[in-house]
C-alpha cells in the first residue's frame, strides 16, 4: 500500500484520432477529479512537448496529482471515470501510468 502522505500521479499520453470524442472526454475529466482531490498539473498538446527520446506517438499529454497513489487508483477505477475512459478509448490510443510521488 502506498504511503498516504506521498502524492500519487496519473500520467496520460494520448494519440487523438477522433477530436469530437476527445472533447467530450476532456469535459468529463475535471468534474470526476473533485471527489478525489485531484488536480491537473499539466495538460498539453504536441506543440508544448519536446520529444527527447523515442518515436513521438502522442499528440496530447497530461499529469494529474492526487493526495496518494491509492486515491489516484480509486479515481481511475471509479464509475464516473470509467465512463470517461470508454469515451477516451473512442477518441484514440492512450497510455496511462499511475505512480507514487516522493
What residue spans do the PLM features occupy?
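Short S/T/G/P-rich N-terminal loop/turn motif that feeds into the first structured element of a domain
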Residues: 1-77, 100-102
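C-terminal end-helix/capping segment
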Residues: 89-102
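A short linear hydrophobic-aromatic micro-motif
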Residues: 39-41, 83-85, 95-96
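C-terminal structural segments of small proteins and small subunits
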Residues: 73-90
Amino acid at each position: 500500500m502506498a504511503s498516504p502522505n506521498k502524492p500519487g500521479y496519473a500520467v496520460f499520453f494520448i494519440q487523438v484520432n477522433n477530436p469530437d470524442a476527445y472533447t467530450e472526454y476532456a469535459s468529463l475529466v475535471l468534474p470526476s477529479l473533485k471527489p478525489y482531490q485531484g488536480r491537473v498539473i499539466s495538460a498539453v498538446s504536441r506543440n508544448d512537448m519536446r520529444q527527447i527520446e523515442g518515436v513521438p506517438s502522442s499528440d496530447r499529454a497530461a499529469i494529474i496529482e492526487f493526495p496518494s497513489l491509492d486515491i489516484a487508483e480509486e479515481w481511475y477505477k471509479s464509475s464516473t471515470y470509467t465512463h470517461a475512459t470508454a469515451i477516451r478509448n473512442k477518441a484514440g490510443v492512450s497510455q496511462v501510468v499511475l505512480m507514487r510521488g516522493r
